[in-house]
Swiss-Prot record:
Organism: Syntrophobacter fumaroxidans (strain DSM 10017 / MPOB)
Positions bearing N6-carboxylysine: 121
Designated name of the protein: Dihydroxy-acid dehydratase
Paired cysteines (S-S): none
UniProt keyword Protein transport, yes or no: no
Enzyme Commission number: 4.2.1.9
Domain of life where this protein originates: Bacteria
Keywords: 2Fe-2S, Amino-acid biosynthesis, Branched-chain amino acid biosynthesis, Iron, Iron-sulfur, Lyase, Magnesium, Metal-binding
Length: 557
């Protein structure tokens, strides 16, 4: 066993002595030692209950004859970090989470690993670590939050963000806003729509690194705790069979995950995270693959924020497995991909059934013929930009808009809420990319304000930053190259015309080449916003959003 490095032989007597100081018996030490990476904390609603999930995992490990050893890692709540300087740390935390799990699992050579995340950057961070380590591993999440209720209407966190814009526009009262504040988020779990956390939890299941049901079983149910026990039991079997993450997360598995991404209408953040995870397995996923798979994958689910349904509805309809079963009917899924169940995708799907075709549309009757996400290219985004096309109003799929330029997310949010943005405008937020932000902040406050103020059918937003999974509307992010490295977005001036052509996957600055050259000759790189601490190091090392915003090492140069 791998753990023999720290427990076997005469020379390891001091090591065993330290284990015994913590109460481990010799019988426990003789079993497989399994790390349980628990990201529980008291600042994320999706993580507030993870101690209970981890306890269920450990119970499962013991039931199957292993010895669990729990350790912790950090987690940022994107909702609470939103619209202030804290959001710069969210994406950047992904790398620290991956590194911390690597450190703990290499310093203490576990035989296997169970990752217990639930929210936005923690899930990809742990998946990156699993593939980097390539020891037997499984991921079990905490599960989605139930929808809230305000009066007779089901609501969620994004309802509150959008209500701020509605209040500013005078269309709701303070009493109505406070009611939403009190009841939109009823308890523990990842926020209730197909936002980034639930997107990544669903994709971990589609990728094969989590058990069926991981993406959709609600946090508050006994079924979630049973799944956690099963994950604990399953890791012992994965160790015995020596099944490792890179044997599961192959090119075919990533294509399956992206295909499911398109069918579900997942968060645009998946376009950052999936390539970053694949990179740890030595797989290069080009952005063009997202367009290729989107063009052939029907959009089958209309989930919040772009539709009426919540994760609990998707779970009741059969979950991710039922979606994959629909896709399999048209051979859009690789059925021979292996999963942590020890069975192939095809075998897993044999018992799956779509029990509610109003939530999971049959593949013969999709919401849209193309997938939820599109990659746009053009002179404004030579390396690409990302939009959740399934959440864009038809009026904004092809439109020429006037540029209203802001140098930060905070300034843009203020301008929108102060009524300075008019129909036909495109809000440009720049110097918010991975290097420029630094940290590539999410733009949920300005996009929610646009929707809340009734401008969703008339105003677009373009940024080198990124968006919350809760964003809807013509919100185009990850514009690459970013402004801080001299990307074309840095050359936009107030009043410029910009063509947003989602139908043809184009994003064009309608300014002639000579004018752009003159502007470029005058452009100077701004001074770094951060000169000390982690974000200063991050800004120095981070790569483009078009390559997953991963950190560059010396050998990458």
């Amino acid at each position: 066993m791998r753990s023999d490095l720290m427990k076997k032989g005469v020379e390891k007597a001091p090591h065993r002595s330290l284990f015994k100081a913590m109460g481990y018996t010799q019988t426990e030490l003789d079993r497989p030692l399994i790390g349980v990476a628990n990201s529980a904390n008291e600042i994320i609603p999706g993580h507030i209950h993870l101690d209970k999930v981890a306890e269920a995992v450990k119970a499962g490990i013991r039931l199957a004859g292993g010895t669990p050893i729990e350790f912790s890692t950090i987690g940022v709540c994107d909702g609470i970090a939103m619209n202030h300087a804290g959001m710069r740390y969210s994406l950047a935390s992904r790398e620290l989470i991956a590194d911390s799990v690597e450190i703990m699992s290499m310093a203490h050579p576990f035989d296997g690993l169970v990752a217990v995340p639930n929210c936005d950057k923690i899930i990809p961070g742990m998946l990156m670590a699993m593939l980097r380590l390539d020891i037997p591993a499984i991921l079990i999440s905490g599960g989605p939050m139930l929808a809230g209720r305000a009066g007779h209407k089901q609501v969620d966190l994004v309802s509150v963000f959008e209500a701020v814009g509605s209040f500013k526009a005078g269309t709701i009262t303070m009493e109505e806003l406070e009611q939403l504040e009190d009841y939109a988020c009823p308890g523990c779990g990842s926020c209730a729509g197909m936002f980034t956390a639930n997107s990544m939890n669903c994709l971990s299941e589609a990728l094969g690194l989590a058990l069926p049901g991981n993406g959709t079983i609600p946090a508050v149910t006994g079924a979630r705790m049973r799944l956690a026990k099963l994950a604990g039991m399953r890791i012992v079997e994965l160790i015995k069979a020596d099944i490792r993450p890179r044997q599961i997360a192959t090119q075919k598995a990533f294509e399956n995950a992206i295909t499911v991404d398109m069918a579900l209408g997942c968060s645009t953040n998946t376009v950052l995270h999936v390539p970053a995870i694949a990179r740890e397995a030595g797989i290069d996923l080009d952005l063009g693959l997202f367009n290729t798979l989107s063009s052939r994958t029907p959009h089958l689910c209309s989930l919040r924020p772009g539709g009426p349904h919540f994760l609990e509805n998707l779970d009741q309809a059969g979950g991710v497995q039922a979606v994959m079963k629909e896709l399999l009917a048209r051979d859009l899924i690789h059925r021979d991909a292996m999963t942590v169940t020890g069975l192939t995708v095809g075998k897993n799907l044999e018992s799956s059934k779509n029990t509610d075709p109003t939530v999971i549309r049959p593949i013969s009757d999709p919401y849209h013929n193309e997938g939820g996400i599109a990659i746009l290219y053009g002179n404004l985004a030579p390396e690409g930009a990302v939009v959740k096309q399934s959440a864009v109003a038809p009026e904004m799929l092809q439109r020429t808009c006037r540029a209203r330029v802001f140098e930060s997310e905070t300034d843009a949010a203020g301008g929108i809420l102060d009524g300075k943005i008019k129909p036909g405008d495109v809000v440009v937020i720049r110097y918010e990319g991975p290097k420029g932000g630094p940290g590539m902040q999410e733009m949920l406050t300005p996009t929610a304000a646009i929707i809340g103020m009734g401008l969703g059918k008339d105003v677009a937003l373009i940024t080198d930053g990124r968006f919350s999974g809760g964003t809807q509307g013509a919100a185009i992010g990850h514009v690459s190259p970013e402004a801080a490295v001299g990307g074309p977005i840095a050359l936009i001036e107030e009043g410029d015309e910009i063509l947003v052509d989602i139908l043809n996957k184009r994003l064009e600055l309608m300014v002639d080449d000579a004018t752009l050259k003159a502007r470029r000759d005058k452009w100077k790189a701004p001074a770094p916003r951060m000169t000390q601490g982690y974000l200063a190091r991050y800004a120095h090392m981070v790569t483009s959003g078009s390559t997953g915003a991963v950190l560059r090492t010396e050998q990458d140069k």
